[in-house]
Amino acid sequence: FDLGNRIEDQVVDRLKQMENIKVSALDKDGKQYRCSFLAGHFAGSTDGVVKNVDPKNPEEVMLLEVKSANNNRFNELQQGESYEQWSSNYAIQIQCYMAALNLSRTLVVVYNKNDSGLYTEIIDIREGVLDEMKQKARQIILARTPPESPYSSTDYRIKKFMSAKEQAVYNLEQLPDNVNCRNCKHSEPILEGDGGWRCNKFNKPIDEAKQRAGCEQHIWLS
């Protein structure tokens, strides 16, 4: 992930060096542009925004999305129909960001980690995606049992990116090592105001330190 962040920073720096494109990677407070919903339980940060991309509408502000990929994945992207077809997860991500920031289009830049090649595409917003994802996120956040896995135990994402221990937990063959309030039946996310979590066993809010520590009254979500 650290390598990916460095690559994203390098791509942003290269865009800034271009005379015609104006890039803003940070908001007026000097922080990443952040989109937050459901009292912070459904949130994410963007790579920034850009202007002067489309010569027909130079003042249009677009979302900037930077990703990196190995050579095989990069070739799949180039040979495919579009960025959104290449990765449905990334597609949903930018659709949510565009709606949250009231933007109509995204400039996508994908960096090839093998040969430094670049793929670019401009993507239009699709109405209704954010509302659909907020509804889905609410259902997951408030769920009292773990959601069903979208991937089988033999899926390459499970085999490649998870340790044996993580695979066992993911496949419900073993409990996690760490007890905390987030995996306890007594806890409940607060979706109003500043958000946070509360304990229904002791009827009080739980700060982050206490969430991580858990307690002897812990009961696993199952």
PLM regions: where:
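Accessory terminal regions of nucleic-acid processing enzymes
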Residues: F1-S222
